[in-house]
Amino acid sequence: MKNVAPKLEDSVYERNFADINPRLTEAQALSEAARCLFCYDAPCIAACPTAIDIPSFIKKITTGNLRGSARTIFEANILGHSCARVCPVEALCEGACVLNQEHKRPVTIGALQRVATDHVLDRGIRVLEAGSPNGRRVALVGAGPASFGCAAELARLGYACRIYERRTVPGGLNTHGIAAYKMRAPEALREVELVRSLGVEIRGGVEVGKDVTIEQLRSEANALFLGIGLGPTESLRIPGENLSGVVDALHFIDRIKNEPFRRIDVGRTVVVIGAGNTSVDAATQAKRLGAESVRVVYRRGPEDVPAYHYEYELAKSDGVVYVFHTLPVRFLGDGALTAIECVRTEVTTDEKGRRMVRAVPGSELRIPCDMAIVAVGQTKAVEWLTRHLSGLELDRGRVKIDGEGRTSLKGVYAGGDCVNGGREVVNAVAEGKAAALGIDPDLGHPRA
């Protein structure tokens, strides 16, 4: 990278990456909890993929029973602590709050959920216990939200669970792929310990398919769960991607999450390609690391931005500038990036009425920059799946399952991003739980 932004004072880094949603005080929590109407057949529960009994945990906060509140949360969602910080609550539980219909501010469910879960984790209070051993074993691939959701549910039913993870540090995107100002890695690792406290074994630094085979796992366990997530960031497949200064958004976010801020170089002028939630995390953090200019280049218009609205607004409030209807075609530079060659685009419709992006002839332009962060989605794990699980049925690169996580292979289950193509942490946990409730009756424990 030719032009690196000057390093900031440590105090500035800490201020820039401080918790974007600070913890409520006890008085604030009690006041906010009192606003809940404790609805019967509460729409907030239906809006939560893990179906946390939200009125119940909030009611317990009003009576000072934070331990019971946390138990209600963790029984439904083993990653309820993380989800309190990173869930898109505006689109889920808080968006469904009935107070919205009265044109009032919804109950800040996420903040209250954090109060309860922080209380028990800060004090080392155990609220969940493993079930009596039933003699059955389950192997899980990938130590992320889906596997945690599955393993925690199974452990409470008495199963011996062992998770295999390629990385040495478990946690999936919670640990490696979410902006540091939303949740620091140590917070995510507290929930990893919660999973371990149920007797779940996590073997890090073990690559399934290389260090141990799928056949070995299937022979040693009664069931196999795939929680492998997605692959690396998609390539743009344009010239110059190997230039110094062109980086993968997920790798960039991972470094910010797990290394000292001062160690991470960022360009003076940065361009982020793509406009999803990962793009926002990359762009805002580049700005907070000291980049003088950060622009997001997107081939469609503002009405098509895939990031959640509040994420989009956060980026703009941080000084990130959006450049719409612009498509990169080449990275320019002599060893190090100096500019991106782009073309303007327009959105048209084809004969079937589908909206299509078309390059405008003669509209070439160059955007000078020192750093380009590619955030255009992740690849699917098709190659790994087809190589190691012959006969596994896929749907557009995603593992095909039924409503309880069963794949086309007997004894093999799946959930999370490898199934849904990349959704939220809470969706992955929910799919892991659903698979556990499919595994249990399949292994001889029918539900009443």
Predicted regions, residues:
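Residue-level detector of alpha-helix initiation sites
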Residues: 78, 144-146, 169, 276-278, ...
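Glycine-rich dinucleotide-binding loop and its adjacent helix/turn
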Residues: 115-132, 193-210, 233-289, 394-408
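N-terminal Rossmann-like FAD-binding beta1-loop-alpha1 element of flavoenzymes
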Residues: 137-162, 279-287
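FAD-site-proximal beta/loop scaffold in flavoenzymes
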Residues: 242-267, 350-422
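Rossmann-like dinucleotide-binding cores of NAD(P)H-dependent redox enzymes
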Residues: 160-163, 167-198, 202, 283-330, ...
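A conserved short coil-to-beta-strand element within the FAD-binding core of flavoproteins
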Residues: 204-215, 325-336, 345
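Ferredoxin-type iron-sulfur electron-transfer modules and their immediate structural context
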Residues: 1-137, 224-242, 327, 332-337, ...
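Conserved hydrophobic helix-helix packing surfaces used for dimerization/oligomerization
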Residues: 138-140, 161, 270, 294, ...
